[in-house]
């Protein structure tokens, strides 16, 4: 007859095996949850809408007049086929051929970043063949957070730069990544905004302005797209490193991202000009399942680095004691 004492002795002698078995079981349960558990999980979380097709049933997938004017006016969903087609056909510029050398002002400077690349290499274990997005790519060389990754680690990605002169210089670099002369939308739909060209980096200052206001040469109207729309147009939902520098609008951009649809491992966010402040970014990213790795503070950068907390869904308590 099995006694409580014999059961206790069995547990003690086979503790390691039992812990391993329980751990594997829990991991499998988490990795392949039942449809009921998925349904219950969605019910317990506060529902956030991201302007996606699945949220607006009845909205036609195909429109008669698929133009950027239509997309802006109707605030098309981030994943609407019309919007993705516009980005793909009219805004995504192909990488320079691999046999065309880079055209750099300072070719001997391997890493022009202000420390962001060091964080990427450390946290991603010198990952090769990765994929990045750099918003605020400037001229593609000066203080670039991705040039080293492209040159030395065989990465590729998306370089987003709305400021006309900076983009013109970027296009001359022969980078081996896709480029867009656009801004990331501050809304969950495409918008056209006015852009201040007088500052070195440039920044969004408001809505689209009239031609008379453009004639002074200080402003430009720029088309913005949600980050998720750009990724879908490129056929990408996995990003190893996202560098976000949009002169104060970083938190607004982050809030447009449907985090349940994309997988972004590492993010560097400039926080210096964000009106809501550093801790607002940290708190928001924590809610999205990211860990604050640390800050980069130099005369040229004020970034906070986040890494996805891949252990968050695997945590559990194991208690082993005699009652």
What do the predicted segments below correspond to?
Residues 2-323:
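Phosphate/nucleotide-binding beta-alpha loop and adjacent structural elements of enzyme active sites
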